[in-house]
Each structure stands twice: as structure tokens, then as C-alpha cells.
């Protein structure tokens, strides 16, 4: 089974529990918080992945971290399950998948808008409004500037890319000219 499939399975299970308890956003925050602590501490990550440390020692370390972060009982049990099943290494992918499932559940989409030049706030709002109408969801737009685009914009929503950049248009023209 692929890493993404495993991560999605665990994330979906936790989202379902979160939905039942009305705690989807809280679980997302706690999972992200724990993932950030783990990512920031390479020594901690190596302890959890090192077979030289026994499962009991790993459980004690995990309990201590859970206590310091004051995580909810459901997230604590979830993290203990990941540890017991040797799936803690998948936590970054699980956290990302959880965020995606939580967004779907709450009707949120997080597209990325990349432009060749900085956009004015009114332009960004106009694009955001258009995306809201197109997707039918609340839009949390991430705006980036990439001077290599020369001009225009590239919008990425999930795995769909809408490329209206000058760079791409020039590449298409060049391709047509080369083919003669």
C-alpha cells in the first residue's frame, strides 16, 4: 500500500471521529502542533524510528509530549495507535491529508495564485470572488509572486492548474514556430 493511501486512511478515520465529537478543527490544530514538534526535533524523530528503543520507552516519551502539549484524549489515542502500528513516520502525510479532509468537510478550498507581478488587493478579491463562484466553496487564497512568469497568473486548485501566464503563452508560440 502506498504511503499516501496509508496516510489518507488514518486521516479519514480521525476526521470521522472529529466530526462525531464536533472537534474537527481542534484535532487539526493538535495534529499540526504535534507534527511541528516532531519535525523541529530530529532527535525525537530518530528515537521513534530507532528499533533499539523499546516500545515501552517510546510510549513513555509519547505520553510526556502529549501531556506537555495538552492534547485531547482522541488525538492522544490516535498518536498512540500510530506508534503501536509503526506508522508515526507517516505523520506529515497524515497531517496533510487530515487538513484536506477537514477542508472538504467544512466546504473550504485552498488554491494557490501565482502572478508574474504583485497584484493589487482589488484584483486579488476579484479573483477570490470568481473562484468562490466557480467552486461553490469558501476560498482561502494563497498569493505568490514569481517573476519568471513574466506576466499573467497561474491558479492551482488541488491537482488542477489554470495557466494564463505570459511564460506559457510564449512557450506555446515558440513550439508552433519550431514545428513550422
Swiss-Prot record:
* Family annotation (SUPFAM superfamilies): N-terminal domain of the delta subunit of the F1F0-ATP synthase
- Family statement drawn from the similarity comment of this UniProt entry: Belongs to the ATPase delta chain family.
The record's principal subcellular location, in a coarse class, is membrane
Keyword Signal belongs to the record: no
Descriptive protein name: ATP synthase subunit delta
User: Which compartments is it annotated to reside in?
Assistant: Cell inner membrane
Superkingdom, taxonomy of origin:
Bacteria
Q: Which InterPro entries match?
A: ATP_synth_OSCP/delta_N_sf, ATPase_OSCP/dsu
Q: How does it assemble?
A: F-type ATPases have 2 components, F(1) - the catalytic core - and F(0) - the membrane proton channel. F(1) has five subunits: alpha(3), beta(3), gamma(1), delta(1), epsilon(1). F(0) has three main subunits: a(1), b(2) and c(10-14). The alpha and beta chains form an alternating ring which encloses part of the gamma chain. F(1) is attached to F(0) by a central stalk formed by the gamma and epsilon chains, while a peripheral stalk is formed by the delta and b chains.
Its GO CC terms are: plasma membrane; proton-transporting ATP synthase complex
Question: Which HAMAP family is this protein grouped with?
Answer: ATP_synth_delta_bact
A Pfam family annotated for this UniProt entry: OSCP
Q: How does it sit in the membrane?
A: Peripheral membrane protein
Gene Ontology molecular function: any one: proton-transporting ATP synthase activity, rotational mechanism
Keyword annotations of the record: ATP synthesis, Cell inner membrane, Cell membrane, CF(1), Hydrogen ion transport, Ion transport, Membrane, Transport
Function of the protein: F(1)F(0) ATP synthase produces ATP from ADP in the presence of a proton or sodium gradient. F-type ATPases consist of two structural domains, F(1) containing the extramembraneous catalytic core and F(0) containing the membrane proton channel, linked together by a central stalk and a peripheral stalk. During catalysis, ATP synthesis in the catalytic domain of F(1) is coupled via a rotary mechanism of the central stalk subunits to proton translocation.
